[in-house]
Amino acid sequence: MKFLDKYKKTKNIRFNSFEETLNISLKRKFKTIVETGTSRGKTKFFFIKRYNWKDGMSTPMFAEYAKFVNGKLHTCDISSKNIKNAKKFTKNFSTYIEFYIQDSLTFLAGFNEPIDLLYLDSLDGHDPIAASNHQLKEAQIAIEKLHDKSLILLDDKGSKTNLSINFFIKNNFKIIYETNHQILLSK
């Protein structure tokens, strides 16, 4: 997957876990990705939108992977501004993405397809208690849509992941890859 090379930047501190996740996804022939919390980008000089590498750039990477495998990325964010920015960054892959402006809990409850790869990254981790509780609720809703080979990638290790990790482990998932920022689980 040579397309990943362009995302390997010094500031993309999450690249290694995304690369590992997508390589496993390819081996497992995954086509359906669900992402809560879309890549925001950032504004420079009030009008120029550009990548925010510290965000990890999940949405463009997942979108390009979806194109590569003829799959679909379903990404939701409560902010219409974030969705608008993500649409600009991913315009070359628009056929392979569905955007949802919705709270992640509502979105996940209404999502009725099996999920191959679940990426939980909604709600900023500045308030670890609220973020952890929210991610746990996402996990509790999404688990029914996962299958035996599904992957779960949790972002903001140590803040948002505090409760969801234990929930997934109690439901027979195991940590298969871990960095300072993210945790990848599978059965």
At which residue positions do the language-model features occur?
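A short alpha-helical cap/connector motif
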Residues: M1-K187
